[in-house]
Amino acid sequence: MKIVLGGDSTMADYPLDQQPMMGWGQALPSYLPPEVNVRNFAKNGSTTRSFIEEGLFEQLLQEVEPNTVVLLQFGHNDQKEKNHVTMEAYIAHLTDMIRQIKEKAGIPILCTPVERRVGEEGRLAHTLSAFLPVLRELSRTEEVVLFDLNRYTYHYYDTLGLEASKALFVWLAPNEHPNYPAGLADDTHFSKLGAHMIARYVAIRLQAFFHEQPLFPDIYYGACMYPEVWSEEIMQSDSHTMKTLGMNFARIGEFMWRDLEPQPGEYDFSLLERALEQYQANGIDVCLCIPTPTPPRWFTKQYPEALVTNQDGTKMHHGSRQHVCTNNEDFRRYAYRLTRKIAEIAEKHENVVMLQLDNEFKCHVDLCYCTTCQTRWHTYLKDSYQSVTNLNECWGTKVWSEWYDAFEDVVLPLTTPFLHNSSLMNAFRRFTTDTLNEFAHDLCHSIRMETALPITHNSAFGFNLQNDELFADLDIAGFDTYAPADNYPAYTMNLDRWRNVKPRNKEMLLLETCTANAGHIENYAAPRPHGFVTSEAFIGYAGNLKSFCFWHFRGHRYGVEQPHSAVLTAWGEPDRGYEEVVRIGELRQQIAPLLAETKYVSAKIAIIYSDYSKRFYTIDHGGVYDYRSLFTEFYGSLIRQGIRVEIIQENSPLEEYDVVLAPFVRWISPTLLKKFAAFTEAGGKLILGPMTGDRTKELAWPATNGLDRLGEWLGFDQIQQFTVKGLTYQLTYDGLKEPLDHLVTVFHCPEDWETIGRGNDQTLLAKKQLAQGEIIYLGALPSNLPDSLIWQSFCRKELFPYESERQLIKCSEGVMKYRRESATHVQLWISNLGLTTADFTLHLPGFERLSGEALARGNHRLEPYENLIIEWEKIVESEESDDSFSHPRA
């Protein structure tokens, strides 16, 4: 593997006569595997313009081969007025470099410029902060990875302090070093210590690019434990019980801030370390959590202004969790300091295998309107829009005389007589997710100062987050789910979504689910049917889960979640679902070798899930739409028909799929549209709508085409969108008629399109055949997808020919399947997650691995929560096979 560097003096190599000065690129090879070749083209004084004009980029480009990683770090010299590089030119130069690297199939990575030790006033300062929002936006639009070296170095200097941080730079007294007899006081260029500090961080971030092996060779099974709640005798007993149950994993620490820091700046990790030692004695690996959702009472007493402010201006009170604003600087200071100390503990204990950030970001809170948020909001708007005139034009603030004369005039979306401007509400939600992700990534920086252990978070569909960007700086996706048994696609949707959040790592972690039922003191929930949870584990592991973890091991006596089932009751007896807990432990032992010898194989049909659209629907919903419900029904309607899919996101590569569906993606970026065009030109099938492309980035209505740039690309005009709720309005398709409800989008399409569905004599569904690919636009969907004959007919025609396992098996509703392969065999892991008996038809005879029985060709029955692993031996390996898999035999 090759890594190529382009940048300025902070990255460059230095000759012996300039030692001890050193660029971080010079130190980087020390932290990489010996087979990784590093070529460093960084040069002192380089700007993005000079790097190109002097031919350095051309030299760099000659080194780029497929999969060559190219790190680009500029800014220090572009910032200087004498070099005459405007921010617009800076962006243009980097964009050009990125695109040329991609043309050679290289992997460009943007780096924010490392921070200087001090600013003009002689104090630690953000001297290069103007580049951060620019580079973040560029990483989004060009879909490249971003390493935020600026915030990492800033926080590193801050933890050392002003004086101690001099050791990272070239500070020399007269005659201290022969190369600098007059001495040197340089707050920009690094000493060997400073260069190695940054190189170590970069190497940690690069691991995903040169480690082909899984992050976790084993599969984990366990539960969340609370050593701070129970006596040490109970902790010892429970850890031993875990071992007897076949568990090998515990998640701990997400709420124990006060036990670790009982008073400000006073730390006590003795309980945590004893717990880790106890788990290690029983062979239990640990996910150690950062307890930032529960700042202690001493913090909120000392900093009451840090409490979340509600929309009506009232303050939340101490208690529950997530009661403090994550933008508050005092909170961040304490959080970062504690996080680094926890990471130091983690590095000391070999059974700590990962760290989890916080717990379920935005689970109980959403927006905050405190004074910190107000100040940061105005800065954020300035960074995003550059001029207040541009903001006004983007938001259309002439409506209702909302025009702003300065960024400081822009209001928070507090309580008003009616609604705020939709663009303002969207921007404030975007600000909230962006600043939360900044906080999360800063926690990662604190962790990586001490350890290279993988970092995760337990996200979920119900929270208002931007998950693709949240997990960009993390190592593996994690999630929590408590899906009901009568809606099994709500569970498998998690598997198909979180597996695809990290483009270079298909592993994922289930960090919380229930043994039988969720619940709290205001919500008693019924237990799952017997067998359902075991099938969740079985199909989850098949779908590439690396952990299946219960919340929690021992039920709580206190708090608010006492009705929630656990492995053991609070008094230590088996709780509801205990038989399944035992069964899953046995199952893990049984299937672990099969999982180890096979790899998950992705489906060839993908659906785009959009957190951007989720944000839009929280604002523009018409009183009827909820994005999560819309998407779950759409996804579930395919799964129930036996169509296996991957759930991807806007920045996912499309070329590995045969069909891509993009429902409810309200804003189509120029980047995504370009990918759509390339995908269809290469022979892909693209199915768009409903409501796809109907809003702008600012959540406004389009200016020249009702579907904005997407409509222009499709060639549509006469576009109208309206609700048919309460009206007699039917969709006609394939000789069938069904009523529609809520929004429909009608349009006129060019002659090279075929109208395939109409609503009251208006075009609703249309198809265009290209030389290779195909495009379909859906202006509406039937009201009840799971029972719609029209939708079933559409799927038979348009999707089933691309279903990955169509030549092996056909499954009825309830049967979920995942495909795994070894070098010699194909396996289908199938489970009936439905409430009733289901059927499947084998087109080829197979061998069932769990029972050791042969399965004949033809129809078979599968009882509720019955699990099978059907295997065939490969006999043909062909890259040109029209079904994209090796033909198997029994």
Where are these regions (language model features)?
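Polysaccharide-binding and catalytic clefts of secreted carbohydrate-active enzymes
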Residues: M316-I476, A490-Y491, R497
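Hydrophobic targeting/anchoring helices
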Residues: T456-E633, Q720-K725, Y729-Y733, L743, ...
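Helical hinge/lid and interdomain linker segments adjacent to catalytic or ligand-binding clefts
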Residues: T48, E53, F57-E58, Y625-T704, ...
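Aromatic- and acidic-residue-enriched carbohydrate-binding clefts of CAZyme catalytic domains
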Residues: S165-N179, F216, G253-E254, L260-G265, ...
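Alpha-helical cap/lid subdomain in secreted, periplasmic
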Residues: L56-H196, R200-Q207
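A conserved amphipathic helix/loop scaffold
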Residues: F664-A890
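Serine-esterase "nucleophile elbow" of acetyl-processing enzymes
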Residues: M1-N44, E58-T68
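Aromatic-lined substrate-binding rim segments of carbohydrate-active enzymes
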Residues: S237-K243, R251-T314, L443-E450
